Amino acid sequence: HPWVFEGEVIRVEPSPENGERAQNGCIVDVFEENGTYQGTGLLSEMSKIRVRIVTRNANDRLNEAFWSRKISWAWEHRKTTMGNRALPGTEPDTNCCRVIFSEADGFPGLIVDRYENVLVAQVGTVGMERLRDAIYPLLLEVFSADGQVIDGIYERNDSPSRLKEGLPQYKGWWTGSSSDENSLIAESTPT
């Protein structure tokens, strides 16, 4: 896993840009004792996993363009692994899938599932909690650019693991709403 555990942290230094100490959930650079860059990640002061690495490229800036590229890559990857969805002009085999799978897609602590025209998001880390209002609109933009209709994002942030990060539990619509809480799911259409 791309993690730095609490026992591996020797010190947290102030930011060279503003001289302030990194706060819980902030983006931080990780270095070995000898100064060798190891990656950039999200700080979690309450977790035994102190930093979750997002990139090992020192030139990456974790800005809107960075997250948008990662979302686009994850979505394109899912489309190519979901049967007929990858073939132009064919009906998809399914209208549901896991769009973002946490560390596997470079979004530590974020899971996003698609159920027909609704995205269901689970945020499990303080770093992703701080970034969610920046990432969710990018999800909608990526889907829209691909011709996909998404009516809303529903948050299922009621996992007990959030308490270990010092986060409250809640669930509800981030955007959109549905009078019908059910979605029609198609999977493995017979041929």
Language model features: what each stretch is:
Residues 30, 39, 119-122, 186, ...:
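Short hydrophobic-aromatic micro-motifs
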Residues 64-68, 128, 132, 136:
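Generic alpha-helical secondary structure
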Residues 102-107, 111-113, 132-191:
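Non-catalytic substrate-recognition/targeting regions of SAM-dependent transferases
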Residues 116-129:
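A short interface-forming secondary-structure element
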Residues 1-116, 171, 175, 181:
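Non-catalytic accessory regions of SAM-dependent methyltransferases
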Residues 7-8, 123-124, 156-158:
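Fold-independent oxyanion-binding glycine-rich loops
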